[in-house]
UniProtKB/Swiss-Prot annotation:
Entry's localization field: Cytoplasm
Name this protein carries in UniProt: Glycine--tRNA ligase
Annotated organism of origin: Methanococcus maripaludis (strain C6 / ATCC BAA-1332)
A GO CC term attached to the entry: cytoplasm
Catalyzed reaction equations: tRNA(Gly) + glycine + ATP = glycyl-tRNA(Gly) + AMP + diphosphate
Alphabetical list of HAMAP family matching this protein: Gly_tRNA_synth_A (MF_00253_A)
Lineage: superkingdom: Archaea
Cited SUPFAM superfamilies: Class II aaRS ABD-related, Class II aaRS and biotin synthetases
Amino acid sequence: MDKYDKIIDLTKRRGFLWNSFEIYGGIAGFFDYGPLGAILKNNVINTWRKHYIVNEGFYEIDSPTVTPYEVLKASGHVENFTDPLVECKGCLESFRADHIIEENVDVDTEGKTLQELQEMIEKNNIKCPKCGGEFKDVSTFNLMFATSIGPGGKRAAFMRPETAQGIFIQFKRISQFFRNKLPFGAVQIGKAYRNEISPRQGVIRLREFTQAEGEFFIDSRKKENFEKFESVKDTVLPLLSGKNQENESLSAEEKIVRMSLSDAVKNGIIAHEAIAYYIAVTKKFLMEIGIDESKLRFRQHLPNEMAHYAADCWDAELYTDRYGWIECVGIADRTNYDLLAHMKNSGEDLSVFVELDEEHEIEAYEIELNYKLVGRTFKGDAKVLEESLKELDDKKMEELVEALETEGKYTLKTCKRDFELLKEYLTAKKVKKIVKGEKIIPHVIEPSYGIDRITYCVMEHAFKEEEDRTVMGFSNAVSPIKVGVFPLVNKEGMPEIAMDLKNKLRENGLIAEYDDSGAIGRRYMRMDEVGTPFCITIDGETLVDNSVTIRERDSRAQFRIPINEVVSYIKDKL
């Protein structure tokens, strides 16, 4: 067995990970978290919350996983959320074209077109791995799970492919919550869905997975000189830039350069200080949850693999024994793509007013409504029309005035309804105004975390085989069970003392496990295997002087402390 198989065997035995729907044969791309796996995953998530909500000042929202078609049409997912597909002419089995090529030929398929993938399959005579048959031509496959809302299937929808869109849709409400003062950030943690063509990488490639995403909204002019960057500028990271990836004269080792974030920004490797800052936050989080620093690198997306919404993107990649480097975090500059797309398609104003350093004079349109005519025509919606006109930017106002002048009518789209405006409904004239600010569409820096992949890497990086034991060397932040409590023997009142201590630990918010079965060495080994950092033994000396033996997982060191100091000692260490 390789390391992956050993870890999966351990996680199944000890209640970390199980195949979903196992008694019905299972389905690829789905896993259940068992009792310890669920705690481990939640500890990863709660550590992430600490970094983004407590430390960074983001606030969390929770939106539906079912998303209407029009939302994902506007975001570009209907057109762009695809993978290349090949189907066998014989057995009709489907495969991801790029993966099937990489499994047969030592070549990088990232960013290749459908035609280029087709040529690779033909040139290398790649056949179906299941039956040996030939493939049909490479095509695209949309990865979203389609569904419908309500009876009759009249309202098309999808299971969300990312949590981010829920934040963008509620941008106006979120901005109001922050009193419309940039910059600010919102996060969402929850399930996302990707109908993978042929997931064959265990827990690495899932069809239902957990994302933790942050959306940091900022004035685009503030990205270059980002105030918080000063605190992380000297952080040194292993960077694999797009330029080095394309430099064929460099070896794989030479392509990765360790440098400070300040140098990376200064030399134009990282686009700006804002995205560099969240790369540093990502590294800090990964270190706290126990990722091996020697198995972490940050890789820049090449232009031909950049997401449709991104101006720059860096992946935190973690090394795994079986699958090599895998993408676990993406830190992207999404510009104002999403807000502009949803403004265009919803008719809602998603701009933010920002104050200028100095006042200045401008020319702007002033609208005067024919309230009698507008009230008679639009009745209760007249107020909606008035407010919508006030929110129009200069470009939209010019468009409206020109249409009324040349065509005598204009359709104003708002989130509530469309207004068919006639020339006689209003007058517009240009006036000079003193302005103290302007409306802008904020840009977005997005750190997006794949929690399931990260949780697996936490397990793999913690997994150690020693001569006489197997250890999950989890960091204290994420270990599922914090303390094992044992009576040395099941008599003389030791079980009662041990049980009482376990209860006190739990009352103080620490997950403690009582175990009185088998030799004490076997009990230590069981706790080592699930990553418990401390074990406490109640023995004969406890009955004499109220002291207990504490044993540390990693060093195996043992020492005694008074039983009434155990809770404070463990809490201090954790």
